[in-house]
C-alpha cells in the first residue's frame, strides 16, 4: 500500500465517494508519474463509475475557483500533490 497520506481539505461529497476518490488517486499515482496522466485516469474512472462529466486537476501549486454540482466536489492532498475533482456539465 502507498505511504502517501490523504488529507481532505474541502469536500461536498458523500463519505463513500470521498474514499473512492482517494483510492482512485492512489491507484493513478502508482500507475503514472505525470500529473496530466494522473488527472486523466481519475477523471475517466469517475466518468465511468458516477457518470460524466467530471473534471480533475492534479498538481503541487495551483489556485482554483470552480462551479460544481451539489455533492460532487473534493479537494485533497495525497502526499505532496493536490487533487481537485468535481462534476460539472
Curated annotation (Swiss-Prot):
Subcellular location field: Cytoplasm, Cytoskeleton
Keyword Cytoplasm in record: yes
Molecular function, one GO term: protein-containing complex binding
SMART domains: Dynein_light
Function: Acts as one of several non-catalytic accessory components of the cytoplasmic dynein 1 complex that are thought to be involved in linking dynein to cargos and to adapter proteins that regulate dynein function. Cytoplasmic dynein 1 acts as a motor for the intracellular retrograde motility of vesicles and organelles along microtubules. May play a role in changing or maintaining the spatial distribution of cytoskeletal structures.
Family label: Belongs to the dynein light chain family.
Protein name, entry field: Dynein light chain 2, cytoplasmic
